[in-house]
From Swiss-Prot:
Its main location: plastid. Belongs to the bacterial ribosomal protein bS6 family. It comes from the Eukaryota. Keywords: Chloroplast, Plastid, Ribonucleoprotein, Ribosomal protein, RNA-binding, rRNA-binding. GO terms for biological process: translation. GO terms for molecular function: small ribosomal subunit rRNA binding; structural constituent of ribosome. It comes from Trieres chinensis (Marine centric diatom). This is Small ribosomal subunit protein bS6c. The lineage of its organism: Eukaryota, Sar, Stramenopiles, Ochrophyta, Bacillariophyta. Gene3D superfamilies: 3.30.70.60. Binds together with bS18 to 16S ribosomal RNA. It is found in: Plastid, Chloroplast. CDD domains: bS6 (cd00473).
């Protein structure tokens, strides 16, 4: 069994979310992480910002930071879920 590692994930979402929808979206993904045996989950909203260039015809985006601990095999599964979410413009998962 592999040991858990700490991760930091930055997610760029479309600008179409209001504050309550953004919290709901982030809470649902935090629950999904919990189901994949993640621990020490912390969600931080970094706000809506202008983008340097258009991504999928979007000039603004909402940034979400999620810090968590998990086994590497579950992180791969979670990143596959993010790839298929139409609200996600970009995401990056880093080891801490």
């Amino acid at each position: 069994m592999s040991a858990t590692k700490k991760y930091e994930m930055m997610i760029l979402l479309t600008e179409e979310f209001n504050d309550s929808e953004l919290k709901t979206w982030a809470f649902n993904y935090a629950k999904a992480l919990r189901k994949l045996s993640a621990s020490e989950i912390s969600v931080i909203s970094r706000g809506k910002r202008d983008l340097s260039y258009y991504i999928n015809n979007q000039k603004k985006g909402n940034f979400i930071q999620i810090n968590f601990s998990s086994m590497p095999k579950y992180v791969d599964n979670f990143s596959k879920n993010l790839k298929f979410d139409s609200n996600v413009l970009r995401f990056l998962i880093l080891n801490k």
